[in-house]
Structure formats: structure tokens, C-alpha cells
């Protein structure tokens, strides 16, 4: 931990935390360089006793310290589940107009606020957890649940919310429900933080600032949130062409058909390069009696990128043709007339398409829906 980024109370407390506790509770203290990004749209706020601020996961009070410094007359509410951090925060701001509540924010009943600011916990819900389908589909995450509750229950009309959260909010298919809500609001800022001073996390993060008023379309593209404006292209998308889109097969469904013989090729992401199929010594094959296979010609699209935080998305695709072949479920299969496949291949080869993909793909994965949304540049 860079001590210059935190108050002494936080650096001392951080030393007492185990990696297990930090991971389980999603504890990542917010460094000063990142905290400052949360206050870029607060210049018009009046520093008056009637001005109210909420920090829904206040921890040891790093973000509250910024609030106290910038708005000393405001009424500040902090909510913290962890008893130790709640106690530290209460003592730290005992002489200020700060009220710390030791509760689970997702169960907390509170009022509405002019400004909500924070860095909510990043914790994926366990398998089997029943999601609120207004927030997420598939496996939810605490950070989107915090975000939804803040917007729908605690943000005043024309109030502003500023959060540091994983960049998956921009295009993850899991979080499409809450993203549809966000897009209806005025997104003042959305910035991908490829470089940041957080400790103990390689999660790609973003800062998002939302005003509780009707949206303007800024920082949005169809059903996605992005950090650059992208022109809309009418109905001219890959998904509008006369093509069939499918995903490959999960390993569990083909495992019994694997063989050492060179029979039916089974491609994985590692085989798909830029306009090239790579067949190496570790190539997988299926027996002729497999029921899981494709036939004929197709364009194979690698959906998972090896790119890390701060790097560009590594896009891969290639045409392939054979009597029988199969792919894993990290590959999208596009089939159709040769002339139409050639159109898609030409689009994917263009630099402008690569730039487009790198704007929208901020979590290292292209979904089929996002692939279909690529314009015919």
C-alpha cells in the first residue's frame, strides 16, 4: 500500500486485514488519485447545511475525508457493514457533521441525498443466489446491487451519483438490466481507469458519474456504456445480415468424445488468430461418433481476449471449412452465403472496427449480442 495515497488510520488498519477477509468482503481502499475523479462534477453544489451526502460503503472513511474537506457544512451519512471499520470511521469524524451507520447497506432504510459517492464492494454472488432481475441476469455482484439501490431509493431528483466500479458495467451481458436503467439517465462521465493506484486488485475499473435526470445519449451506444462517443449507424450492423450465429460446445458436453487420433478437429480460443487458424501439437480432436459438430464453411470468432488491464483487446477470427469440425463455447460460429461471410470478414479486418471493439469491449469478452452490434463500416 502506497501510504501517500491514504490516511494513517487506513494504512494502519489495512495491515490487520487478511487477504481472505479483503476478498470475501470486497475491501479495496480508494487511493487519493482515484478519489479525486469522483468530485469532478460537484462544482455547482452549494456548501450549505442543507446539502446532503451519502457514502454507502464508507470503510475507514477515505472518501468521507474528501467530502468533509470540500463540503464542511454538508450533512454526511456513511454506511458500513464491518463493525471494526465503522468504529474507526465514527471516531475519526466524531467532531464533524458526519453520521456513521453500522449496517448492511442493502438492507438499510434511509432517505434521499443530493450527492452519493463511493467505491462499493466488488463481490460476485455465489452460485445459486437468486438475483433481482431488475439488476442482473446470470450471477450478480454486490457493486451493481449497491448501484441500483442508490439510484432507485436514495438519489434525489437532479442529484448526482459518482462511483468507482468495475468496467464490466459497460458491456457485460450479466448487467444488461441495470445498464438499461442507467442509459435512461444523464451520464455526465464514464472513464476507463487503465492505470490506477489500487492495491491487491487487477480488476479493470471505471469512474461513472450519473445525474438523476433524463439521459442525453452521451457515453452510450445502443445498450452499452462506453468512454467515447460512437455514431449510430441506422440498421447497418453485422447482426442485420443474412447469417446464422451460434456458440460452440462446453467441454463437459464433448469430453467423452476426445481422442488422440486426428479425426474431427476441436478448436479453442488458442487456435484462433487474426485471420488465421493455428493448428499446433496440442490440437484437440473428437471421434467420428460425436454428436456435437458443425459442417461446411464458417467464420470463427474468438470471444475471450488475453489482454490485461491497460492493454488493448486482442481480437481473433478466421474462415474455416471442413466436412466435420467443432469449437468450444468461447468461439462464436457464423454461417451463411460466401458473399455475406466475406462482407463480415472485410469489416473485421478494418482498423475502424478494431477501434470500435476496443471502445466497447472493456471487460475482455465479446458477447454474441455485442458482435452483432458492430456496424458495417
Swiss-Prot record:
Record Pfam families: Eco57I
The record ties this protein, via SUPFAM superfamilies, to: S-adenosyl-L-methionine-dependent methyltransferases (SSF53335)
The biological processes this protein is annotated with in GO are:
DNA modification; methylation
What keywords is this UniProt entry annotated with? DNA-binding, Methyltransferase, S-adenosyl-L-methionine, Transferase
What EC designation does it have? 2.1.1.72
Top-level EC class as recorded in UniProt: transferase
- The protein's name: Modification methylase CviBIII
From what organism does this protein derive?
Answer: Paramecium bursaria Chlorella virus NC1A (PBCV-NC1A)
Amino acid at each position: 500500500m502506497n501510504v501517500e495515497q491514504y490516511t494513517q488510520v487506513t494504512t494502519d488498519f489495512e495491515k490487520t486485514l487478511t487477504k481472505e477477509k479483503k476478498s470475501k468482503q470486497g475491501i479495496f481502499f480508494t487511493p487519493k488519485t482515484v478519489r479525486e475523479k469522483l468530485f469532478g462534477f460537484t462544482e455547482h453544489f452549494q456548501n450549505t447545511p442543507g446539502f446532503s451526502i451519502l457514502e454507502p460503503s464508507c470503510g475507514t472513511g477515505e472518501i468521507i475525508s474528501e467530502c468533509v474537506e470540500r463540503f464542511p457544512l454538508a450533512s454526511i451519512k456513511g454506511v458500513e457493514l464491518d463493525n471494526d471499520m465503522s468504529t474507526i470511521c465514527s471516531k475519526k469524524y466524531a467532531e464533524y457533521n458526519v453520521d456513521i451507520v453500522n449496517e448492511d447497506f442493502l438492507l438499510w432504510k434511509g432517505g434521499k441525498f443530493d450527492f452519493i459517492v463511493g467505491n462499493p464492494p466488488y463481490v460476485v454472488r455465489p452460485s445459486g443466489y437468486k438475483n433481482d432481475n431488475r439488476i442482473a441476469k446470470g450471477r450478480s455482484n454486490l457493486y451493481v446491487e449497491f448501484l441500483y439501490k442508490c439510484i432507485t431509493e436514495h438519489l434525489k431528483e437532479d442529484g448526482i451519483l459518482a462511483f468507482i466500479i468495475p468496467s464490466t458495467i459497460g458491456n457485460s451481458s450479466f448487467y444488461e438490466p441495470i445498464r438499461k436503467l442507467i442509459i435512461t439517465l444523464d451520464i455526465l462521465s464514464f472513464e476507463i481507469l487503465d492505470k490506477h493506484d489500487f492495491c491487491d486488485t487487477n480488476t479493470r475499473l471505471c469512474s461513472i458519474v450519473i445525474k438523476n435526470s433524463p439521459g442525453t445519449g452521451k457515453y452510450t451506444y445502443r445498450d452499452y456504456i462506453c468512454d467515447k462517443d460512437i455514431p449510430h449507424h441506422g440498421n447497418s450492423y453485422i447482426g442485420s445480415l443474412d447469417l446464422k450465429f451460434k456458440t460452440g460446445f462446453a467441454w463437459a458436453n464433448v469430453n467423452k468424445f476426445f481422442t488422440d487420433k486426428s479425426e474431427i478437429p476441436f478448436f479453442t480460443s488458442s487456435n484462433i488468430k487474426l485471420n488465421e487458424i493455428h493448428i499446433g501439437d496440442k490440437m484437440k480432436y473428437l471421434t467420428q461418433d460425436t454428436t456435437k459438430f458443425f459442417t461446411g464453411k464458417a467464420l470463427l470468432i474468438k470471444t475471450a481476449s488475453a489482454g490485461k488491464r491497460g492493454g488493448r483487446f486482442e481480437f481473433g477470427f478466421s474462415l474455416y471449412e471442413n466436412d466435420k469440425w467443432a469449437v468450444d463455447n468461447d468461439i462464436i460460429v457464423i454461417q451463411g452465403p460466401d458473399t455475406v461471410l466475406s462482407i463480415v470478414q472485410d469489416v473485421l479486418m478494418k482498423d475502424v472496427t478494431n477501434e470500435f471493439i476496443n471502445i466497447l469491449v472493456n471487460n475482455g469478452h465479446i458477447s454474441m449480442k455485442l458482435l452483432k452490434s458492430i456496424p458495417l463500416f
